[in-house]
Amino acid sequence: APYKDLPVKLLKLVLLTHEHSDHIKGLGVFLRKYQVPVYATEGTINCILNNKTVGKVDSDLFNVIKPDRDFSIKDIELLPLHISHDAADPVCYRFFEKEKSCAVVTDLGEYDDKLVSSLQNLDAVLIESNHDVNMLQTGSYPYSLKQRIWGNKGHLSNEACGRLLNRLLSDRLKHILLGHLSEENNYPELAYQAVRNEINFSPDKYQADNLDIRVASRVKPSCLVEF
């Protein structure tokens, strides 16, 4: 059966990137029902438990991980990587299994050479393409929120996403999923085209037509990507 039809009870653990509500909403209900282990940084865990943002949960379910230190869960090796975001101790994740590797990279206002180096030689990536700059500038958000979003601890614009991808592209990286799109300040078509333009206009040899670039839905599971 397609993975989107699999029952929730088959989920064996939870990985958290940070404590913002759009990333932990529903966590308390899920843990009270299924009691699976949760992996997150110490700062993230402390925010969740001390602020009781998820309600009453068993603190023993939480496992502390450290940025830039890998750990294993069964046959999968995971590497949490520090990111620049306005949260307590945020990370993105890189996954390794046998000869394959992928990453989930969202919620970052900027990136540095260390992060770029840590994300080389991927086979697939889900990467943030949060907003269209013009839509954000002219939209209804308060100016303070706009500053937060386009700040260095905010979110990557469509063009910034494309520029980061240009530094990650290799002969291995074929599958790109654009994610964490703003509902108010972006459209899937805008994100898709902006990222393609950044890739195609780069002096590097890679062209968007040779890549599997898709946009993740905000409301339903994306299609299965195999690599």
Kindly label every feature range from the protein language model:
Residues L11-E19, Y39-E42, A103-T106, L126-E128, ...:
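Active-site neighborhood of phospho(di)ester-bond hydrolases with catalytic His/Asp-centered motifs
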Residues I24-A87:
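Glycine/small-residue-rich loop that forms an oxyanion/phosphate-binding "nest" at active or ligand-binding sites
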Residues D113-V215:
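Cap/insert and terminal regions of metallo-dependent hydrolase folds
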